[in-house]
Amino acid sequence: MKKIALIIVLVLAFTSCKEEPINPDRFKYGTFEIPEGKGYEKTIIVRQDSIQIETYEDRIDTLSISWKNNFNYTLKMINPKTAIDEDPIHIKITNIDKDSYDFEAVIGHSNYVQKGKLIKKSN
């Protein structure tokens, strides 16, 4: 009888300690921040449906967002002002934490990879 009770306790202990998987879908909507970094100011991002609005350095840009899967998406300026604004920005999520993710961004077909962190502030 003691063995059965011990087995039940152990099973309950192991199943209750199971960590919930991190769901990347929560990064598809809400308000986010990219902290200030070397060469760029803090950026505030609001995502709704297929639109992303970015506010930085007293500028506001509106981009369409197209998700390839939970870890890759493409941004495209809706009203490009320069030739470089016409190129799509390909984003790859490289690591997910509780309320943030690390990413790599490539503009167009460039070989330059910009790395950064996006932090979720609210839904």
Where would I find each of the regions flagged by the language model?
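An anionic, turn-rich surface loop/hairpin at beta-sheet edges
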Residues: L75-K98
